[in-house]
């Protein structure tokens, strides 16, 4: 049982921060959920958003308990997101910065291959109040990304979204992360 009314106790920024994972689910597998983010009343439809997001995650985890197959999709946005979070995230004594969901939201954008879909996602972020960009030291973020659990032997598996509702895991050299951060070769 999930009681959406408890969300009213959260500051608005935390509420929106949590929605980033639901936006992720919509991009990976649920175009109808994405439509809610584009045009729906988020607060009125929060029960549906929660239901659809949990249904997606439950389905993935039940099919792949060990993260060797489709469960990898849940890492979408997290490779870059965790790098940003390590450098700019709210943690420990650092009380100013970005929350986890905000970092993941930023990490999803470069992994969306369709420019048209990127534009739509940016519009959703604006609508929700998620960040579209943030200033950060790219070298530090890149260095943090090299410590990602998916980085092994100079390779890293990233999740890319070529279009709404579809994704693929792609193993690339870790140097391939640099252009995703907008770094020069």
Language-model segments: what does each one mean?
Residues 1-40, 162-163:
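A glycine/threonine-rich phosphate-anchoring loop and its flanking beta-alpha core
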Residues 6, 56, 70, 160, ...:
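Glycine-rich, flexible loop/turn motifs
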Residues 7, 59, 145:
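Glycine-rich, charged/polar anion/phosphate-binding loops
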Residues 11, 86, 170-171:
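Short, function-defining helix-loop hinge/capping sites that tune catalysis or transport
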Residues 14, 88-89, 174-176:
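Single-residue recognition of alpha-helix boundary sites
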Residues 20-23, 117-185:
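C-terminal charged capping/lid subdomain of soluble metabolic enzymes
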Residues 32-140:
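Active-site segments that bind and position negatively charged phosphate/pyrophosphate groups
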């Amino acid at each position: 049982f999930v009681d959406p009314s408890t969300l009213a106790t959260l500051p608005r920024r935390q509420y929106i921060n949590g929605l980033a994972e639901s936006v992720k689910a919509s991009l990976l597998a649920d175009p109808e959920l994405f439509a809610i983010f584009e045009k729906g009343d988020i607060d009125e439809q929060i029960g549906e958003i929660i239901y659809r997001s949990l249904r997606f995650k439950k389905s993935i985890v039940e099919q792949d308990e060990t993260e060797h197959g489709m469960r990898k999709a849940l890492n979408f946005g997290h490779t870059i997101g965790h790098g940003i979070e390590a450098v700019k995230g709210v943690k420990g004594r650092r009380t100013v910065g970005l929350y986890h969901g905000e970092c993941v939201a930023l990490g999803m954008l470069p992994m969306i291959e369709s420019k048209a879909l990127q534009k739509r996602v940016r519009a959703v972020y604006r609508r929700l109040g998620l960040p579209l960009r943030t200033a950060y030291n790219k070298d530090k973020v890149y260095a943090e990304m090299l410590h990602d659990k998916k980085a092994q032997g100079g390779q890293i598996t990233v999740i890319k979204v070529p279009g709404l509702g579809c994704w693929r895991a792609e193993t690339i050299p870790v140097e391939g992360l640099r252009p995703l951060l907008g770094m020069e070769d």
